[in-house]
Amino acid sequence: MLKIIIPSIMLIPLTWFSNNKKVWINVTSYSFVINMIALVTLWQVNDITTNFSTMFSTDSLSSPLTMLTIWLLPLMLLASQKHIKNQTDFNKKMYISLLITLQVLLIMTFSANELIMFYILFEATLIPTLIIITRWGNQAERLNAGLYFLFYTLIGSIPLLIALISIQNTLGTLNIMLLSLDSSPQTPTWSSHILWLACIMAFMIKMP
C-alpha cells in the first residue's frame, strides 16, 4: 500500500516545485503512472483479503473503490483546467494540492482495518472538500453550499461515532478482520436497528 500512498503524497512537492507552465502536465502524467501501479497492485480476482499491514488491507470490495479513487485524480485535473485557467499560479497549485490530499485520505479510508480509523479518515476528507467547494465552486451559492455540507456532515457523523463506541463496548474490538470472525447468532432488536440507522446515516447524508 505504501507504493501507492507515498507516490501520491509526493505529488504535492511535485506540484509546488514544477514550472508554472508545466504543472498540469507533470501532475497529470505522474498520476497516470500511479494509476498503472495501483492497477497491478490492487487487482484481485477472488474474495481473499490482501494484507498489507496491521492497519491497512484491501479485499474485493475496497480494491475497486481504491482504484476508482486513484483514477479520479487525473480525470478531475483534466476536467478542471479550463475552469481555473484564469486563477493565479498559487491558487492553481493549491487546488491541485487539495485534490491530491483528498485522494490520499480516501485511499487510506478504503483500506483501513479499524473502523475508528475509517471514521477519522472519512471525516478528514471534509476539510479539503469544504475548501474546494467554498473557494473554487462554480455557483454563487458556494458559501451556503459549503456551510450546509459542513453541518449535515457533522450531524450525520456524530451518530456514527456513537454507534462505533457502542460496538467497541459490546464486542471489544473494531477491527474488521476480527469482526468478520464473530459467528455468534445475533437476534434483531430495536437497538440493533438504531445502530444500523446511525451507521448508514453518515453515508446517506454525503450522497448529494
Swiss-Prot record:
Coiled-coil annotated residue ranges, if any: none
Cellular location of this protein? Mitochondrion inner membrane
Q: What is this protein called?
A: NADH-ubiquinone oxidoreductase chain 4
What is this enzyme's class at the first EC digit? translocase
Reaction(s) catalysed by this chain's protein: a ubiquinone + NADH + 5 H(+)(in) = a ubiquinol + NAD(+) + 4 H(+)(out)
Q: Which organism is it from?
A: Phodopus sungorus
EC number(s): the record gives: 7.1.1.2
Membrane-related topology note: Multi-pass membrane protein
What PANTHER family does the database record attribute to this sequence? Answer: NADH-UBIQUINONE OXIDOREDUCTASE CHAIN 4
Main subcellular location of this protein, as a coarse class = mitochondrion
Q: What does this protein do?
A: Core subunit of the mitochondrial membrane respiratory chain NADH dehydrogenase (Complex I) which catalyzes electron transfer from NADH through the respiratory chain, using ubiquinone as an electron acceptor. Essential for the catalytic activity and assembly of complex I.
What the entry lists under Pfam families is as follows:
Oxidored_q5_N (PF01059), Proton_antipo_M (PF00361)
An annotated GO cellular component of this protein is: mitochondrial inner membrane
InterPro entries, A to Z? NADH4_N, NADH_UbQ_OxRdtase, ND/Mrp_TM
Similarity comment: Belongs to the complex I subunit 4 family.
GO biological process per UniProt: electron transport coupled proton transport; mitochondrial electron transport, NADH to ubiquinone; mitochondrial respiratory chain complex I assembly
| Alphabetic keyword roster | Electron transport, Membrane, Mitochondrion, Mitochondrion inner membrane, NAD, Respiratory chain, Translocase, Transmembrane, Transmembrane helix, Transport, Ubiquinone
Task: Reply yes or no: does the keyword Ubl conjugation apply.
Answer: no
Q: Give each disulfide bond as a residue pair.
A: none
Q: Which GO terms describe its molecular function?
A: NADH dehydrogenase (ubiquinone) activity; ubiquinone binding
Indicate the quaternary assembly. Answer: Core subunit of respiratory chain NADH dehydrogenase (Complex I) which is composed of 45 different subunits.
